[in-house]
Amino acid sequence: MKTLNVLALVLVLLCINASTEWPTHTVCKEENLEIYYKSCDPQQDFAFSIDRCSDVTTHTFDIRAAMVLRQSIKELYAKVDLIINGKTVLSYSETLCGPGLSKLIFCGKKKGEHLYYEGPITLGIKEIPQRDYTITARLTNEDRATVACADFTVKNYLDY
């Protein structure tokens, strides 16, 4: 009987480890706007939420994001790509943390520490484009190691 229990446990653990993708999470879903995300970091998922889906249509809205850091953050770089029909149509990059530059409260955090952000973000655009598209966001540190990575799927049919 013990052998059967051990075998069942081993099979469950193997099946769990065999998965190479994280689940798709729903950020918000309303009549004309849906936003989903999936971690594109094979080693780590994270939590992300928006208070109200309709807030996204304003150019500043509140988010919550949380994770345990697998990499220290002395320097932090963001790269964001807008992908439509499988083609990158817009790419944006920015240094968020670096020597003499700390745009975020978690600059300087160490590996293993909890990262939690709750507050406003500004998109820098007046309207979210209508249609279905993907936004890939990747944060890397000074060693070019992935700190966080996500693919956001946006389905926007709002009339402005």
Swiss-Prot record:
Entry-linked SUPFAM superfamilies: E set domains
Residues in the signal sequence: 1-20
One Gene Ontology term, aspect cellular component: extracellular region
Stored InterPro entries: Ig_E-set, LY86, ML_dom
Source species, domain of life: Eukaryota
Biological process, per Gene Ontology: inflammatory response; innate immune response; positive regulation of lipopolysaccharide-mediated signaling pathway
Cellular localization per UniProt: Secreted, Extracellular space
Coiled coil region boundaries: none
Main localisation: secreted
Tissue/organ expression: Detected in the macrophage-like 10.4 cells.
Keyword annotations: Disulfide bond, Immunity, Inflammatory response, Innate immunity, Secreted, Signal
Entry's induction text: By myb.
Disulfide bonds: 28-53, 40-149, 97-107
Oligomer and partners: M-shaped tetramer of two CD180-LY86 heterodimers.
Record function comment: May cooperate with CD180 and TLR4 to mediate the innate immune response to bacterial lipopolysaccharide (LPS) and cytokine production. Important for efficient CD180 cell surface expression.
Name this polypeptide is given: Lymphocyte antigen 86
Gene name for this UniProt entry: LY86
